[in-house]
Swiss-Prot record:
Glycosylation sites: 295, 319
Places the protein is found: Secreted
Post-translational modification: In response to low blood pressure, the enzyme renin/REN cleaves angiotensinogen to produce angiotensin-1. Angiotensin-1 is a substrate of ACE (angiotensin converting enzyme) that removes a dipeptide to yield the physiologically active peptide angiotensin-2. Angiotensin-1 and angiotensin-2 can be further processed to generate angiotensin-3, angiotensin-4. Angiotensin 1-9 is cleaved from angiotensin-1 by ACE2 and can be further processed by ACE to produce angiotensin 1-7, angiotensin 1-5 and angiotensin 1-4.
Full protein name: Angiotensinogen
PANTHER family: ANGIOTENSINOGEN, SERINE PROTEASE INHIBITOR, SERPIN
First and last residue of the signal peptide: 1-24
Disulfide cysteine pairs (residue numbers): 42-161
Entries under InterPro entries matching the protein: Angiotensinogen (IPR000227), Angiotensinogen_serpin_dom (IPR033834), Serpin_dom (IPR023796), Serpin_fam (IPR000215), Serpin_sf (IPR036186), Serpin_sf_1 (IPR042178), Serpin_sf_2 (IPR042185)
Gene Ontology BP, a term: positive regulation of cardiac muscle cell apoptotic process
Family membership noted in the UniProt record: Belongs to the serpin family.
Keyword field: Disulfide bond, Glycoprotein, Secreted, Signal, Vasoactive, Vasoconstrictor
Function recorded in the entry: Essential component of the renin-angiotensin system (RAS), a potent regulator of blood pressure, body fluid and electrolyte homeostasis.
GO cellular component, one term: extracellular region
Amino acid sequence: MTPTGAGLKATIFCILTWVSLTAGDRVYIHPFHLLYYSKSTCAQLENPSVETLPEPTFEPVPIQAKTSPVDEKTLRDKLVLATEKLEAEDRQRAAQVAMIANFMGFRMYKMLSEARGVASGAVLSPPALFGTLVSFYLGSLDPTASQLQVLLGVPVKEGDCTSRLDGHKVLTALQAVQGLLVTQGGSSSQTPLLQSTVVGLFTAPGLRLKQPFVESLGPFTPAIFPRSLDLSTDPVLAAQKINRFVQAVTGWKMNLPLEGVSTDSTLFFNTYVHFQGKMRGFSQLTGLHEFWVDNSTSVSVPMLSGTGNFQHWSDAQNNFSVTRVPLGESVTLLLIQPQCASDLDRVEVLVFQHDFLTWIKNPPPRAIRLTLPQLEIRGSYNLQDLLAQAKLSTLLGAEANLGKMGDTNPRVGEVLNSILLELQAGEEEQPTESAQQPGSPEVLDVTLSSPFLFAIYERDSGALHFLGRVDNPQNVV
């Protein structure tokens, strides 16, 4: 066996071990045939009918070049348009991709929580994480491509093209997943949800990116910004320039790290996500209200409150309750609150697992007065750190084969995922239903004034778009 072959098998074994450990006893077998290369495509790839020409390349413009800001409404309209054209098979692909992204998200959320430590909060977008990894898959060659596919949780057979993920199909399905989130059936009474994704490809001068690779990321997001800057002379200054650029282009107030990076890096692949939802029938309470970070410490924060008919249930055995708040026709905010705040770590480990959706029940709605902090959550993490924590630091390290990304193999530095999640009062709207009818049960008061978990779930695809933990509404994570 060649050294390269031995290294590939060893790395894949390491990845499989990590996947199996995080999955517990679960056997992760699903039909992925809709996401694989077809036999006809494999035949074309293995026996091209025409001579393959060199792929066109380009050098990104300098980061200080004038750039038009992102139009979030246009991004949303493109997602809506793509979703309106979905056929039955497209929806099946979207459901498969959502399932894989959910599973990947739980694994990485566990790593993120462990890295953050106790009582520091966390937020993660499984689709954004998944899209980032699939983007690298599209830009990679073996052995890196096979390793990334295994990391995504999809089996690969050595030498079998038809067991390979078709990255273009996968990102198109991910586009459908995002579109189903923001498309709410055109209901005029429902405030539209907003989700925007921006990708920054920040390169060292001299690295030329391959045009087909950059274009292939279009379904993930049309808002792609390749920009060049000096990454080696002053890494801290480079990080500041990137942050200023992102702020200027998006207008989003995000938690962007200012740490310097490795001076020999030639590519940063950064993904930025903004989600904004209006809570129909909720209004902001006057003044500030106490949120208990722990038994002895409170902070004063703005609170939202609304009364309506919501689904709510308690798990008496595990001592937590769940309140289900609609954000759209198929989108739900799940608020998970332990009966005792000190149990949050235990509940987090118990609930945020691969079988999370089995915890979601469907009880009859009941009259509830719900009060919770106004959420404006900012979070960032470097995927490289999570891979290193999982002992997979070489996956996107110096030896990674990313030959489809640029004219020379890029050396990947930062792989940032940054999230801005906003849940606001929908004061201009009426409550979902009247709070209480004659003869109905008394209104239940549910107040989230201590640490809790949350998730945003879209029913049609089965996607969990966000997983998070709020320890202190004033903190970024």
